[in-house]
Curated annotation (Swiss-Prot):
SUPFAM superfamilies: RmlC-like cupins
InterPro entries: KduI, KduI/IolB_isomerase, KduI_N, RmlC-like_jellyroll, RmlC_Cupin_sf
Catalytic activity annotation: 5-dehydro-4-deoxy-D-glucuronate = 3-deoxy-D-glycero-2,5-hexodiulosonate
Key words, A-Z: Isomerase, Metal-binding, Zinc
Protein name: 4-deoxy-L-threo-5-hexosulose-uronate ketol-isomerase
A Pfam family matched in the record: KduI
Amino acid sequence: MDVRQSIHSEHAKTLDTQALRREFLIENIFVADEYTMVYSHIDRIIVGGIMPVSHPVEIGGEVGKQLGVSRLLDRRELGVINIGGAGAIIVDGQRHDIGHRDALYIGKGAKELVFVSNEASRPAKFYYNCAPAHTAYPTKKVSPADVAPVTLGDNLTSNRRTINKYFVPDVLETCQLSMGLTELAPGNLWNTMPCHTHERRMEVYLYFNMEEDSCVFHMMGQPQETRHIVMRNEQAVISPSWSIHSGVGTKAYTFIWGMVGENQVFDDMDHVAVQDLR
């Protein structure tokens, strides 16, 4: 388990490129036949990926020991979105078939967590966010058909995008975790611009659907002290509450956003005008 400490905004603005990447970038999300796990002190979120290829991958008691409990979800909830081939997640003996862009919410208290791919040649890629939980809500599958997409932006400002809200109060009940998927229309490059912060939540982005010769310049920092991190395909970035989180790509891309904190109201954000950015 890779542990990332919290960092003050005054400290963050003094960091060079390598230090920024070390603090906020998660480079290796998917590793064949393993789970990856990054534990952030910021709202205690855990982020990672699971890619079963030649055999199922189980998250067992070894993780619980690192968290001071018996199992990962003794005091946590888990959200998973599959961006790879078809697969399944077995939760306490019950199999949930999870296709491409299907999602599964797993509530507090689940013990057995096994991840499988249907085909080794096209493995599932289970991306997950995991957050502290105070009560148990039912495990529930969410498919793209269950999500009412919202299209925002304009081709003229190169930010036309479709937002799919998977884990939000209108779709299912969670303790604090919110997750969704945003896809840019072809020829559009900007996400979340004009940008915002949200004092009551932190956020993590996973960028994907990117070609090998493309990248995203992820914008971060306080609005008057902006920095950037160059992102490649299937990499994630941690965004503290004080930081903007926006990006511009060399080509269109898709990203998964996950938020934890004290407020699940999607529109609870502090907007920043473009002319106020520095």
